[in-house]
């Protein structure tokens, strides 16, 4: 029987891997520059965690979660997003005792049962950050700054930042009544999904992709913000303007998760069509308390790695290619192979990527393989070389060849690679943001 990958998943290999290295390395580098520390949470959690945080009536909980009952009779869900698990870990491990604010970043797979298409998979990967313990508008600005710096580090140009404030619970109470009154007069003109949301989560009607014109004419949340939320939002806009972080206000921006309050933002890329959102987030001031902790204001964002890679490819950005083989060691005979392994180990300790033959092929076949791998140098060890305690070092770029004694081969190779501008590239590629 031949097995195939499950629908909505992909195998990542070959020419795609450098793009993943590129995006993930940049994500980590920028997060570290802002003082964030990595957090790793389980890929599955109790189902109630997501029902309580994301929202019982959201599309994620209603339609998209991978949920199962384990052998102990517990309802378990593969994580559809990373914020709730991070807050759960923060509370469970009493990280509040470490002082506030706490800054975390994560990279990992998420799972949602959606219709697979470009930029939307059932297993997808996210880079996310969470800043726990600040209600100050400066935290919102710094978070958006981090997002922008991350995208700029990928050399992306064709993106736009959209922001909105959806207020606090008090603001939204009056706003929801205004929305309900408005949509009651347009009920016959909204889609079936919106009719369901009308009863369960009326603010999500603003996010409808079918009845766009109806949503455009709906009341604006900005008219219902309390003084505190309005001041908070105005402070954010002023600081972003002062910092020359260009943004667009979008009064229909509400986000699809119930835990958001006040600031919400999305960053969209013009080349990705329907799946144009490459990064999104906002403030979730009530989530810690909702999950059994103290009332701790927090915010963050998540960015889909797959969509970022699509954006990088769409802009034809040249990315660093990770080295798989700088040096290939071709050996003939058992004793030569032992020596090849010794030399390879010496080079690897100097951070040089090396591949040695392990198939006992002919010298011609080995050199052909070295060329196919893109090696810069080939070290050749045969019976004659063993007898003289030397190797042949062939520069595959210039087709020149030199004889070098065993004791000096590592230093010779390092000097030669330095001339070619490749010394140590295996562990240093991508460190310049």
From Swiss-Prot:
Keyword check for Ligase, yes or no: yes
What are the recorded GO MF terms, alphabetically?
ATP binding; histidine-tRNA ligase activity
- Report which superkingdom the organism of origin falls in: Bacteria
* UniProt keywords, alphabetically: Aminoacyl-tRNA synthetase, ATP-binding, Cytoplasm, Ligase, Nucleotide-binding, Protein biosynthesis
GO BP of this protein: histidyl-tRNA aminoacylation
Which cellular component terms (GO) are annotated to the entry?
A: cytoplasm
- Cellular location(s): Cytoplasm
Checking InterPro entries in the record gives: aa-tRNA-synth_II (IPR006195), aa-tRNA-synth_II/BPL/LPL (IPR045864), Anticodon-bd (IPR004154), Anticodon-bd_dom_sf (IPR036621), His-tRNA-ligase (IPR015807), HisRS-like_core (IPR041715), HisRS/HisZ (IPR004516), HisRS_anticodon (IPR033656)
Reactions catalysed, semicolon-separated, are:
tRNA(His) + L-histidine + ATP = L-histidyl-tRNA(His) + AMP + diphosphate + H(+)
- Give a yes or no for keyword Ligase in this entry: yes
Q: CDD domains per the record? A: HisRS-like_core, HisRS_anticodon
Q: Which Gene3D superfamilies match?
A: Anticodon-binding domain, Bira Bifunctional Protein, Domain 2
Q: Which EC number(s) does the record attach to this protein?
A: 6.1.1.21
Family (UniProt): Belongs to the class-II aminoacyl-tRNA synthetase family.
Q: How does it assemble?
A: Homodimer.
Its protein name is Histidine--tRNA ligase
Originating gene: hisS
